[in-house]
From Swiss-Prot:
The keyword Flavoprotein does not apply. This is Copper chaperone for superoxide dismutase. Its main location: cytoplasm. Homodimer, and heterodimer with SOD1. Interacts with COMMD1. Interacts with XIAP/BIRC4. Interacts with SLC31A1(via C-terminal domain); this interaction is Cu(1+)-mediated. The heterodimer CCS:SOD1 interacts with SLC31A1; this heterotrimer is Cu(1+)-mediated and its maintenance is regulated through SOD1 activation. The gene is Ccs. Cu cation 1 binds at C22, C25. Disulfide bonds join C141-C227. The lineage of its organism: Eukaryota, Metazoa, Chordata, Craniata, Vertebrata. Ubiquitous.
Length: 274
C-alpha cells in the first residue's frame, strides 16, 4: 500500500511559486517548514517568489504548510533531489459525485518512479489505483481499457515481480474521504504512461491473492470511480509562466479556478485545495 506522509522514502525537489513581498514573508516560510518531519532542505528566493523544498512529503502537504503562512502557493515543478528532470506527468481525476483529485508522476531515476497525490470524495477505506491502457474518456472511465500490461503478466501487488505494469496497489481514504499518498514504483516509467489513464476503484485491490475469478485480472476492486488522462507536466524550472496566455489569468488567480470550463471564468469559484 502507499506510504503515509512522513514515513520516509526517496527525497524529491518541489518548486513552488509563493506570494512573497518582504523579508518577513521569507522568515515566515522558514519558520513554518523548520523541523517538519520529511522536510530536508528549504531554499527561499524572494526576488523570484520561489520556494524550493527537498522533501519526502506529498506536494499537497507541503503546499498546505506554505499556505498556512497566509500566502498563496502554487506547485510549478518537480524533480529529483539532484535537481534533474527525468520526466514528470500529472493526471486530473474526476468521476462519480464529488470525487476529484490530482496525481503526479515523477521519474526519480531510471529505476524509480514516484506517484503522489490527493483524491477527495472517497468512501473511507482502501481503494485500488491503476494505470490503464488508454487515455480514452469518451465513455467516462469505462473506455480506459484494461490495466497497463505490456508484459502480458497476471495482476498482482506493487511489490510483485509478476504484475501488470499499471498495478499501483491501494490508497487509503481517511474518515473525511481524502486519500493522500506517496508511492515509489520500480516498474513504471513516466515516458511509458503519458497519454494513458489513471483510475481509482470503488473497493480494495486484493493484489491477486483473493481467490476470486477477477483477482488475477483486476484485483476484484469493484467499479471504476474516477479517472483522468496522464499528461506531461513541467519539471523543475521548466514553467516560468506568470500569466496564462489563453485567458490572461495570473497563476494566483488560477490557483482557485478549475483548469477548464465555465467555472474558470467565475471569480467566486472557491479553491479546490488539491
Amino acid at each position: 500500500m502507499a506510504s503515509k506522509s512522513g514515513d520516509g522514502g526517496t527525497v524529491c525537489a518541489l518548486e513552488f511559486a509563493v506570494q512573497m513581498s518582504c523579508q518577513s514573508c521569507v522568515d515566515a516560510v522558514h519558520k513554518t517548514l523548520k523541523g517538519v518531519a520529511g522536510v530536508q532542505n528549504v531554499d527561499v528566493q524572494l526576488e523570484n517568489q520561489m520556494v524550493l523544498v527537498q522533501t519526502t512529503l506529498p506536494s499537497q502537504e507541503v503546499q498546505a504548510l506554505l499556505e498556512s503562512t497566509g500566502r498563496q502557493a502554487v506547485l510549478k515543478g518537480m524533480g529529483s533531489s539532484q535537481l534533474q528532470n527525468l520526466g514528470a506527468a500529472v493526471a486530473i481525476l474526476e468521476g462519480c459525485g464529488s470525487i476529484q483529485g490530482v496525481v503526479r508522476f515523477l521519474q526519480l531515476s531510471s529505476e524509480l518512479c514516484l506517484i503522489e497525490g490527493t483524491i477527495d470524495g472517497l468512501e473511507p477505506g482502501l481503494h485500488g489505483l491503476h494505470v490503464h491502457q488508454y487515455g480514452d474518456l469518451t465513455r467516462d472511465c469505462n473506455s480506459c481499457g484494461d490495466h497497463f500490461n505490456p508484459d502480458g503478466a497476471s495482476h498482482g501487488g506493487p511489490q510483485d515481480t509478476d504484475r501488470h505494469r499499471g498495478d499501483l496497489g491501494n490508497v487509503r481514504a481517511e474518515a473525511g474521504g481524502r486519500a493522500t499518498f506517496r508511492i515509489e514504483d520500480k516498474q513504471l516509467k513516466v515516458w511509458d504512461v503519458i497519454g494513458r489513464s489513471l483510475v481509482i476503484d470503488e473497493g480494495e485491490d486484493d493484489l491477486g491473492r483473493g481467490g476470486h475469478p477477477l483477482s488475477k485480472i483486476t484485483g476484484n476492486s469493484g467499479k471504476r470511480l474516477a479517472c483522468g488522462i496522464i499528461a506531461r507536466s513541467a519539471g523543475l524550472f521548466q514553467n516560468p509562466k506568470q500569466i496564462c496566455s489563453c485567458d490572461g489569468l495570473t497563476i494566483w488567480e488560477e490557483r482557485g479556478r478549475p483548469i477548464a470550463g465555465q467555472g474558470r471564468k467565475d471569480s467566486a469559484q472557491p479553491p479546490a485545495h488539491l
